[in-house]
């Protein structure tokens, strides 16, 4: 038996429609998009553009401003380094994934970029004030996660976007844990949205998206063949070409398209309700066990993620015991040094993350086994 509750890392299983779309894409799209005028290349180009349109419509963007990336980390690096290429001040939150924190820290160390970290609180107004208090005349970008990959806490990103809009500051949002689970649109005030294709969007690994409203220029961090302006040694200055050097993840893009269509057909509210119902049931069961620490605050809102610890047992040791029974959960520090520093965890946490295909019965059985582990200290 293997039960996957590590869907915050990548969703599994994938919808049947995604699996079928992948099989179909491998059979049909054997050309290279934008590289050739023959039938295979043209058919593949049309399919890639269709995937781009689907993603653009889903996030309220224009297709030409919708860029396929290798993953969310790639998209965030393009956005952060591209927007901050001329220097300036940037602000990130204290719950950021290393996909934001590391490129930001590297820029602050090596270039004319200064960095501030805004503390996140359970209370949204306190969090917004935390960001507001750090804004300077030189602030060029605010980068924050929509939802923490450790606890699932949803940041007041729409209010943070208002701060940015009033001051002409670029707002870059990390949607890896939110997109496909809650509705996220550029009309929320986001200038550049970066997300993964293989998590809530149900695509395959090796896929990500950068979606821009086109208001802030993004200097390319990589140059190469784009299928356009091939006679010039200069990188194209228009999207998506400026940020899509080399062959894009064509087959992966087909999977993301199918995943988005699955979400639209199923209903994003229904997906969230199912996953959050499982989380609330799991929390209810854990709350009955003495010595279980659950990292959720009543005042905050969350996507369907629950971080917890079993007494003083190191999180990775506890997770390994659960894995022996067939339960897949991520433990440790979740590539989020800042978040765990704020939480004050000594050995990280165990992260429970269901998907639309998860079962409340399996979650209840896991909670029951957690109780046995807590009481015995072993499986």
What is each model feature region?
Residues 1-379:
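Pyridoxal 5′-phosphate
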């Amino acid at each position: 038996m293997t039960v996957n509750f590590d869907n915050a890392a990548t969703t599994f299983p994938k919808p049947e429609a995604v699996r079928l779309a992948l099989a179909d894409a491998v059979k049909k799209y054997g050309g290279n998009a934008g590289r050739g005028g023959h039938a295979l290349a043209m058919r593949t180009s049309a399919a890639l553009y269709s995937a781009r349109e689907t993603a653009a419509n889903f996030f309220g963007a224009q297709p030409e401003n919708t860029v396929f990336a290798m993953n969310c980390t790639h998209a965030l690096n393009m956005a952060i380094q591209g927007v901050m290429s001329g220097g300036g001040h940037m602000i990130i939150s204290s719950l950021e994934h290393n996909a934001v924190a590391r490129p930001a820290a590297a820029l602050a160390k090596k270039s004319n970029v200064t960095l501030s970290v805004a503390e996140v609180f359970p209370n949204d107004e306190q969090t917004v004030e935390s960001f507001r208090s750090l804004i300077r005349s030189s602030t060029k970008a605010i980068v924050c996660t929509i939802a923490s990959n450790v606890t699932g806490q949803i940041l007041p990103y729409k209010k943070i976007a208002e701060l940015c809009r009033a001051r002409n500051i670029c707002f870059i949002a990390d949607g890896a844990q939110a997109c496909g689970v809650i509705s996220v649109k550029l009309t929320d005030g986001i200038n550049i949205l970066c997300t993964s294709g293989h998590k809530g969007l149900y695509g395959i690994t090796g896929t990500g998206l950068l979606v821009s409203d086109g208001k802030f220029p993004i200097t390319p961090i990589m140059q190469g063949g784009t299928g356009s302006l091939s006679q010039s040694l200069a990188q194209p200055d228009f999207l998506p070409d400026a940020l899509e050097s080399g062959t894009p993840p064509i087959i992966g893009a087909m999977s993301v398209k199918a995943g988005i269509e699955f979400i639209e057909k199923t209903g994003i509210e229904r997906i969230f309700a199912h996953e959050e119902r499982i989380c609330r049931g799991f929390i209810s069961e854990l709350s009955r066990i003495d010595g279980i620490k659950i990292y959720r605050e009543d005042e905050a809102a969350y996507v369907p993620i629950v971080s917890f610890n079993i007494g003083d047992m190191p999180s990775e040791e506890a997770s390994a015991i659960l894995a022996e029974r067939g339960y897949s959960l991520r433990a440790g520090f979740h590539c989020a040094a800042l978040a765990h520093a704020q939480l004050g965890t000594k050995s990280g946490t165990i992260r429970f993350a269901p998907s639309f295909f998860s079962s409340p019965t399996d979650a209840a059985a896991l909670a029951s086994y957690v109780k046995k582990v807590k009481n015995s200290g072993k499986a």
